[in-house]
Amino acid sequence: MREPVILCVSANPGMDRRLRMKSLVVGSINRASSAEGFAGGKAAHVAMAAHALLAKSVWIAFLGGPIGEECVTQMESLGVRVVSMPSSAPTRVNLEIIDDSGQITEILEPGGAPAASEAQEFLQRCRREIENAGESGLLAISGRLPSGVGADLYVSLIEAARANGLPSFIDSSGEALRLSVEAKPQFVKVNRQEAEDLIGKAVQTTPEAVSAAQEIIRRGAARVAITLGSEGLIWVEANDGPVWKAKPPQLQVVSAVGSGDATLAGFARAATLGITGEDAIRLAAACGAANCSAIAPGRIELATVKSLLPQIEVQRL
């Protein structure tokens, strides 16, 4: 059997620029004590985390300019295969500012608009990668779409995956998420805010999160996970399937940026290994927790994940 491959699609990647400083003062000059740059964007985080879990991961991304080239270099150095699709728009930079108190401020640049011909070529290349992956593969679509790209791009990819026997996992927001859910993906992963925006109701408690997941299932998804920050996550399956909640232990957090993406990587890896139920959500939660102490978003370590597995509290609701 062909080794399963996890295709991580990134239509709007970026460079994660992490700045550390004593404190951030708005309206004043702020000097950083250190600065680091990491290949980023949600799908990049998924690809790196999946690779750490010994999965064969492929990162398919719009990339432009010197920053895009640096992202390719970094991802390839980690062992991730990169399918770089040229974009006339320079790859964006996302700032993550960490002060001495541990407070994190994120400033995310908008993604530049690729040309219409570039968007079409991106879609066609994704379809070829889906066809080449075979039925043992998995499609993971993460992040927002760049300006100028139709909200139905992800729908086309979900349909291509279905036609080739691949399950599709989606983590997005806004109109792209709404349309993707209606396209009936196998799995949807959203955070609390994204769930609230999608269904138009509050998602503050566990019962509300379960209700939101069930509503997303009614709209088309087969399985839904909603991440709830330090409270963990819930996972609901269609057809009156089991409802699970997982909660990680209290941790020393460096940064939670990318933890939802690492969680998605855990679910994706579980799917390619045939792991289901309690063991799947335990692995996903351990990946999300491991990301909190990682050197950069998505760069989890397998040893850390393994050490966290027995510490994850899993409950069937």
Predicted regions and their residues:
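Conserved phosphate-binding/catalytic region of the ribokinase-like
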Residues: 178, 206-317
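Short beta-strands and strand-loop turn motifs
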Residues: 106-108, 136-144, 171, 189-194
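Conserved N-terminal subdomain of the carbohydrate kinase-like
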Residues: 52-137, 307-317
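Conserved phosphate/ATP/ADP-binding segment of small-molecule kinases
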Residues: 152-243
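Glycine-rich beta-alpha junction loops
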Residues: 11-15, 63-64, 89, 194, ...
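Gly/Ala-rich phosphate-binding loop of Rossmann-like dinucleotide-binding domains
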Residues: 51, 162, 272
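Glycine-rich phosphate/adenosyl-contacting loop at the front of the ribokinase-like
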Residues: 1-60, 69-70, 252, 317
